[in-house]
């Protein structure tokens, strides 16, 4: 394979059997120039180059971002694929590299990164969050920069989105933000404080994610007969009224509708928090 274009010391474009490829590898372009032969032992990652905006953006990132940021980003992606035992959506190489480099730049300049969805992310995406913790140690070792938990949450979101082959983070953010909004409604309407580091909190967040994903997919997940629905409405009156408020809010803000039986299950989760708050 001959080098067609050098993007940086660790990235080149080659032509191989009528296909253009982007090759990544530490020092793959060191002391090389156009038309030189590629050293196969230097190749760490190969991408078939396609004439799409994603690949044009990828090349632009490889040419413009700091090379150590790109190397760290690729190490994190490789670690994620190994830990999750999957092949991650290739779009992550653009979005994540760009995000991580900007985050490192902000932290280097003493700026504070805040993530209002951090607690939900820890519960919803625990494996991805562990990968973020691994990334923190790597970045500290390579750059001497400490990555706060808030940014680890952002890393986890990128990994989760790419893991599920989503085109962007919109759906992941929508679900996580919706859950954060629901929890705030419960706290405000019932005048209670939901402690995040508890089993009940984890159950509620996990249940909401599961329900939202299945309802969005048009799948029925629970069966409750009319008698049981009436019992829940009567026995857990305040909790059910809170669930109704949640349903109204979510429909208005997200265009998403919880069926009545799902609101009953949400009411049962709410009741746990409400009972504990009243008992104190």
UniProtKB/Swiss-Prot annotation:
Domain annotation PRD: ranges: 64-169, 170-280
Record-level Gene Ontology MF annotations: RNA binding
Phosphohistidine: residues bearing it: 99, 207, 269
PTM annotation: Phosphorylated by HPr (PtsH). Also phosphorylated by SacX on His-99, leading to its inactivation.
The UniProt record lists the keyword Transmembrane: no
GO biological process, one term: positive regulation of DNA-templated transcription
A Pfam short name: PRD
SMART domains: CAT_RBD
InterPro entries linked: BglG_antiterminators, CAT_RNA-bd_dom, CAT_RNA-bd_dom_sf, PRD, PRD_sf, Transcrpt_antitermin_CS
Region (RNA-binding): 1-55
Keyword annotations of the record: Activator, Phosphoprotein, Repeat, RNA-binding, Transcription, Transcription regulation
UniProt keyword Transcription regulation, yes or no: yes
Family classification: Belongs to the transcriptional antiterminator BglG family.
Primary role: In the presence of sucrose, SacY is activated and prevents premature termination of transcription by binding to a RNA-antiterminator (RAT) sequence (partially overlapping with the terminator sequence) located upstream of the sacB gene. Formation of the SacY-RAT complex prevents alternative formation of the terminator, allowing transcription of the sacB gene. In the absence of sucrose, inhibition of SacY activity by SacX leads to termination of transcription.
PANTHER family linked to this entry: CRYPTIC BETA-GLUCOSIDE BGL OPERON ANTITERMINATOR
Identification of the protein by name: Levansucrase and sucrase synthesis operon antiterminator
Organism field: Bacillus subtilis (strain 168)
Gene field: sacY
